[in-house]
């Protein structure tokens, strides 16, 4: 679906039902496109830990990520700590991972790589 443009440039679409749950072959295609992210929970979620120098930068990242989540209408689970954020994506409405999770993972990584919180 998003193969013609980079994931970070794609936008989330409403996805409901198990027809939108990604199979193993598609997961294997998409995972290399989001370096640093890992499959978790037997392939039902996508996670990555982002590290920061201090709490201020951690929260700045969380706030910027909230804007992305709002714009895409796709919201991660977050574990917020003093110097790191654990981000977890999964699409509850499909019972696992969807294209939206990979789109948002790519956008999240791009935010971090741009050093938006430095």
Curated annotation (Swiss-Prot):
Keyword Membrane: no
Pfam families on file: Pterin_4a (PF01329)
GO molecular function, one term: 4-alpha-hydroxytetrahydrobiopterin dehydratase activity
Gene3D superfamilies: Transcriptional coactivator/pterin dehydratase
Domain of life: Bacteria
InterPro entries assigned: PCD_sf, Pterin_deHydtase
Alphabetically ordered keywords of this record: Lyase
Substrates-to-products reaction catalysed: (4aS,6R)-4a-hydroxy-L-erythro-5,6,7,8-tetrahydrobiopterin = (6R)-L-erythro-6,7-dihydrobiopterin + H2O
The EC number(s) this enzyme carries: 4.2.1.96
GO biological process, one term: tetrahydrobiopterin biosynthetic process
NCBIfam families the UniProt entry points to: PRK00823.1-4
Family affiliation: Belongs to the pterin-4-alpha-carbinolamine dehydratase family.
HAMAP family documented for this protein: Pterin_4_alpha
Name of the protein in its database record: Putative pterin-4-alpha-carbinolamine dehydratase
Organism expressing this protein natively: Xanthomonas axonopodis pv. citri (strain 306)
Lineage: Bacteria, Pseudomonadati, Pseudomonadota, Gammaproteobacteria, Lysobacterales
